[in-house]
């Protein structure tokens, strides 16, 4: 590096390794630290459970909190997949996110969860940092985190954008030491009995949205307004029937009211978007975590 230079270093955290790097490359730096402007409101509850009872508690925890967007953390990939299978067999729509998935699969999984097409995401700690998903109203630590720093990042996925959130941690007899370490960091943790969980059997854990895939994106100069126009002025959807629109380099994803999904797949395949026809799929994830095309509709001219 030249001796005369201006260097700026930005980091979301300032741990020892970053501090060491900074001391080697920065010249008499001015350090600016930005604190949170708003107090984060996360209510934490801890439940002592038997390992064999964890899975059956999940639906009750969701219904008792009237949660619509749920992020469940496991320590191992195999636990994620097993829990996903079990919840799927209980009739719940779930996604999985861990390091065995390719980057494209991860991206699509995050899109399907963040646009509310799936209510439940089961993940390892690959999802605890760097994700910006609004409106996650319940975090469940199916496995207690390995340390208090990981716990902090996990529960930070809820209560974003100034909103409140709930974080629930399940722990067994073997986790007592880690529970005490976490409690030393967080003074407002409530120990609860599973007997006090009020399971609302009438509560339906479901999504009102589904996702369509369009094989065109930023590289084709597609914009959200182009897709919105094709859906509303083009085929007659109401804006309330359209959710989040995500546009990547070569693909676009649109959340659609599930009552309208068949209509959209049929009609949009015959409607030009910005003067061109595109292939239209419905996107979904199977129990193995693979993102699939449930229905394929395309119109070529």
Locate the predicted segments by residue.
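Post-DEXD/H (motif II) to motif III coupling segment of the RecA-like Helicase ATP-binding lobe
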Residues: 1-35, 182, 188
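Conserved interdomain hinge at the start of the Helicase C-terminal
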Residues: 42-86
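Conserved segment of the helicase C-terminal RecA-like domain
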Residues: 157-192
